[in-house]
């Protein structure tokens, strides 16, 4: 059954400005794995904004906000063909432990100005 749906859209320029204004932004928001991915793609702002929107969409699908979790508890990585995958840790993982067979679906897209992410979380009550 569907446990939650989340969507987020962000202007790419907002992420670009946040990175330029605050040297700690990347480490505060993204995991080491995510930052290594950004290094490989030359820190493209549209990709960074898409990952940020993905984290926000997942939190909305969880339905709890960031209470008792950090944004880095949500890690967005890619499979071998580039499909975005989600790994939950810490407080985010705790929020889904009350369900079994949890699947997190994620789609990320962007145009010149905006990045958008859509997430669906499926699972069964224990």
Curated annotation (Swiss-Prot):
Signal peptide: none annotated. It is an enzyme of class 2 (transferase). It catalyses: apo-[ACP] + CoA = holo-[ACP] + adenosine 3',5'-bisphosphate + H(+). GO terms for molecular function: holo-[acyl-carrier-protein] synthase activity; magnesium ion binding. Its main location: cytoplasm. Mg(2+) binds at residues 8, 56. GO terms for biological process: fatty acid biosynthetic process. Its EC number is 2.7.8.7. It is found in: Cytoplasm. Pfam families: ACPS (PF01648). InterPro entries: 4-PPantetheinyl_Trfase_dom, 4-PPantetheinyl_Trfase_dom_sf, ACPS, Ppantetheine-prot_Trfase_dom. It comes from the Bacteria. One of its GO terms (cellular component) is cytoplasm. Coiled coil: none annotated. Belongs to the P-Pant transferase superfamily. AcpS family. HAMAP family: AcpS (MF_00101). Transfers the 4'-phosphopantetheine moiety from coenzyme A to a Ser of acyl-carrier-protein. This is Holo-[acyl-carrier-protein] synthase. It comes from Clostridium tetani (strain Massachusetts / E88). The gene is acpS.
